Curated annotation (Swiss-Prot):
Pfam families: Mycop_pep_DUF31. Residues 37-60, 69-79 have a biased composition (Basic and acidic residues). The lineage of its organism: Bacteria, Bacillati, Mycoplasmatota, Mycoplasmoidales, Mycoplasmoidaceae. Residues 32-82 are annotated as: Disordered. InterPro entries: Mycoplasma_peptidase_DUF31. Belongs to the MG067/MG068/MG395 family. This is Uncharacterized protein MPN_583. It comes from the Bacteria.
Length: 225
């Protein structure tokens, strides 16, 4: 990948992650254009007149939108051309339960560059639930970590897939009861370009116009998987 390129990095860890929690639907939602116009019109009518308090103004400006589900490719194509906004998109999130074996170089990189920075960020934000007070971070090694992500949002960012999975699953093995993923050594790295992929983004409400990166990665820093 060029140093100035942005990419979502998809890494195959030692064992298969488990889904700990998902939202009710892994689908794209869009806001119908006519509904958005209707909401905008209604909000303008509800705007408080001069002299009314700020709270009333805020309530009028934050009326909820109604999103519609895109059921399949045909419905999606038809709705996008006929009735939906081209820029508005929304997806629910998932939390993955991920078991890492830190004696494995790939798992160690995932821990060092994704899990540990997330834990440090959480602690700097106040650690209100004291998630990492007991047990300590050291005691969590080779146990479970949790990753939060938005599974399908349209964007044009490339995907860098690292440590690819073999299609043949007939020789499955386990480590401590966890299913081991089979690496494809003939094709360990793949760069894909697709409009729908797991992406960590900020949801930006009714003026959302694309994916923004939560973490602005410094491309001058290099680490190898």
């Amino acid at each position: 990948m060029p140093n100035n390129a942005q990419a979502f990095v998809n890494v195959q860890t030692t064992v298969i992650p488990k889904t700990a929690f998902t939202a009710h639907d892994f689908v794209n939602y869009t806001l119908p254009k006519d509904k958005k116009k209707q909401n905008d019109t209604e909000n303008k009518k509800k705007q408080p007149k001069d002299g009314e308090n700020d709270k009333q103004k805020e309530q009028a400006e934050t009326q909820p939108f109604e999103w519609i589900q895109q059921k399949d490719a045909d419905d999606k194509k038809e709705s996008n051309t006929a009735n939906t906004s081209d820029s508005l998109a929304y997806a629910d999130f998932a939390v993955l339960e991920l078991t890492l074996f830190l004696d494995n170089p790939v798992d160690k990189k995932v821990f060092d560059h994704f899990i540990q920075p997330a834990i440090k960020t959480y602690e700097q934000l106040g650690n209100s639930l004291k998630l990492f007070a007991k047990p300590t971070l050291t005691e969590l090694k080779n146990h479970r970590y949790y990753l939060s992500g938005y599974p399908f949002l349209e964007n044009k960012v490339n995907v860098l897939s690292v440590n690819q999975i073999k299609k043949d699953t007939s020789t499955e093995t386990t480590i401590n009861g966890q299913t081991v993923q089979q690496s494809n050594h003939e094709q360990p790295l793949i760069v894909r370009s697709t409009i729908a992929k797991p992406t960590l983004i900020r949801n930006q409400g009714d003026d959302f116009n694309g994916s923004n990166w939560v973490w602005n990665y410094d491309n001058s820093r290099v680490f190898r998987f």
